[in-house]
Amino acid sequence: MSFFNRFGILISVYLCPDKWYNEGVMRRSIKPFVVYLFFLLVIGGLIFLDHQHHRQADVQVEKAEKTTQTSETDKEKVVEDRLATMTLEEKVGQLFWARVPADHQIEDLKSYHLSGYILFGRDFEGQTLEDMKVLTSRYQAASKTPLLIGSDEEGGTVTRISSILETPFQSPMTLYHQGGMEAVLSDARKKAEVLKSVGINAGLFPVADLAGDSSAFIYDRTIGQDAQITASYVKQVVEELQKNKVGSTLKHFPGYGDNGDSHTDIIRDNRSLDDLRQADFLPFQAGIDAGADSILVSHNILTKIDTVPSSISPKINEILRKELNFKGVIMTDDLDMAGLADFVSQDEAALQVILAGNDLILGSSYQTQIPYLLKKVSSGDLTEERIDESVRRILAWKYDLGLFDRSQ
């Protein structure tokens, strides 16, 4: 019996029940039909629920896209409004992320309009976590524009805050050997919480370098694994830092490899661009795809790419921007390091850093470098438009870290 025949019987039963009871059809026909109808209703219900699920998912995606678009619009407005009110001197000051000076810390923040301070070992000596929170709050209160407060916190041999912790932060390599990636990520979460609790909003990690030689300068600071595992490590650490709104910095682009120490020497790296693409670029690309905030460029000279240190090389900057499609903040390694300081003067280095396309200058010579850059703007060697490009990226990073929340 077809569906339509059975449906007709059901209607007839409803309209003339006595007739059908008398004829005994109810007993023969209705029971199987009710079962048949029940299954149709179940299937129909499942189809309806599936449709509703997909509809709700589409609505959620649409809401998320609108929220993202609204957030980006809000960020752009905050950045552009702040940029429009800044003097040239304030803009140039934003290009400098400085070591905390031995004296006049508050005065220099106000006089030079610095983008922020980087804390080193001496800044933690004799302090408690509460002391550091008070100190960073004083720095923030003294600055018209919210500050980047950073500290090298890779773990192991490179950690500043560990000197005042009961349990120092270990290196990623040690953690990976002890407990795999979960141990590394657990450490990253804890580190982010501690840093944020004392007002440090950027930890200058993770190290994205590869080194095959265990005696290489950078080896102990890496996770000590191949390009694929290192890429996974970098990606996941960046994501952990994002959750806590602690800034991430991938270093040291374009990859240290097995080379010497640019703190003490000019380093020349003879690897080709193809060599770097096949291995060293992979962790950096993974970090970029995960949303890394910033990338630190080394002073190593990649002889097959350029004749100058990477930190002042337009070609290296172009690789980051165009090939790896990085949109965030590009900073230099410390300009006081011999790998650059023995190559070019401090003041000229600052100019070359910005002309190469970088955004943030790390170092301690800002008292002469800032006036030098202002002079170069006056002479036409450096344009305010070029400065604005970098300041926009720096302010956008500060917005993403939630630093403008306190000042609006």
PLM ranges: what are they?
Residues 16, 48-85, 91-93, 408:
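N-terminal, intrinsically disordered, polar/charged segments of Gram-positive cell-envelope systems
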Residues 92-100, 115-119, 147-153, 203-206, ...:
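Hydrophobic faces of well-ordered beta-strands that scaffold small-molecule active sites
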Residues 70, 74-134:
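DNA-contacting surface of Y-family translesion DNA polymerases
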Residues 87, 125-138, 229-375, 382-386, ...:
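Second-shell residues forming the walls of enzyme active-site clefts
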Residues 378-406:
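Mid-to-C-terminal alpha-helical segments outside catalytic/metal-binding sites
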Residues 140-166, 187-208, 230-254:
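Glycine-rich, aromatic-flanked loop segments that form ligand/cofactor-binding clefts
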Residues 23-39:
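N-terminal Sec-pathway targeting helices
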Residues 100-110, 184-192, 278-283, 344-350:
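Short, acidic/polar
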